[in-house]
Each structure stands twice: as structure tokens, then as C-alpha cells.
Design a protein with these regions (language model features):
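Short C-terminal domain-edge/linker segments immediately following a structured domain
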Residues: 3-5, 27-31, 94-100, 123-127
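C-terminal cap of metal-dependent C-N hydrolases
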Residues: 61-112, 116
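Generic structural signal for well-ordered, non-membrane alpha-helical segments
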Residues: 8, 33, 37, 108, ...
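His/Asp/Glu-enriched, well-ordered alpha-helical/loop segment
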Residues: 1-70, 85-87
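Short, solvent-exposed cationic patches
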Residues: 116-130
Length: 130
């Protein structure tokens, strides 16, 4: 799914939604968190005919996200995979094809403040018809 048919491009949120919809229609045990994650990763890659991604293995393309789950909101969570669908939304560290692009919650590849200012200017111009 993407911005053409949805209001966000968040793979984790889509996996969670798929799991919840299965549970509403087919019962609480209809889809586990692990099944939802596999559907979102391996399943998505398989649908696209991409054997080079969708899994963490030698030779596969990979983007790796790391969340800090040491906070009180994650305390007592017994299923660590469930944290992916219900845990923190802000990534601590992010690697895209081996290159770190977020470190300790901060984007490392561009100046976020400048990007926000530019976006605000462009949005204002668009709304003003300039």
C-alpha cells in the first residue's frame, strides 16, 4: 500500500492493521504477530518477485531499524516480536543497505531543520497559489 491509496507509508502500521483485521473477522488467534511480520517482509518480497530482500540473510538487501524498548511503555512485554507492532514509533537507529541514516534518534544524512523549513515554505506557496 502507499500514498496513492493510503494516508501513510508505514509498513509496521500496515502489518498491525492486517493482523487486527484478521482477528476481527476470524477470531483472536487468526494471525500472530510473527505471521503479520512475515507477511509484511517475506510475503511482500515474494509478491514482488524479489528474492534479494524480505529477509535478513547473507547476500540479501536489508534495512534494519532498532527501537529503544527500555522505557516504561515496554516494561513487562513478554513477546519481543509484539513490540514491533505495539512499541515505540520513533526509531533509535536505522541502517539502509548498510549505511546508518539515523543515530540515537537523529537523522545523519541531511539537516532536518532545513528540510522542515523548506517544506513549510513550499506548502505555504502551494496553498497561496504561487
Amino acid at each position: 500500500d502507499g500514498s496513492a491509496s493510503n494516508d501513510a507509508g508505514n509498513l509496521i502500521a500496515e502489518a498491525r492493521q492486517a493482523m487486527l483485521l484478521q482477528r476481527v473477522v476470524n477470531g483472536a488467534d487468526a494471525m500472530s504477530v510473527r505471521e503479520a511480520l512475515e507477511l509484511a517482509t517475506r510475503g511482500g518480497a515474494n509478491v514482488l518477485g524479489r528474492s534479494d530482500c524480505g529477509r535478513i540473510s547473507i547476500g540479501s538487501r536489508a534495512d534494519i531499524a532498532i527501537w529503544d524498548v527500555s522505557g516504561v511503555e515496554s516494561a513487562g512485554s513478554w513477546d519481543k516480536s509484539a513490540l514491533l507492532l505495539s512499541g515505540p514509533t520513533t526509531v533509535r537507529d536505522l541502517f539502509v543497505e548498510g549505511r546508518q541514516v539515523v543515530r540515537e534518534g537523529q537523522i545523519t544524512t541531511f539537516n532536518l531543520g532545513e528540510a522542515i523549513a523548506l517544506q513549510s515554505t513550499l506548502a505555504r506557496q502551494l496553498c497561496d497559489g504561487n
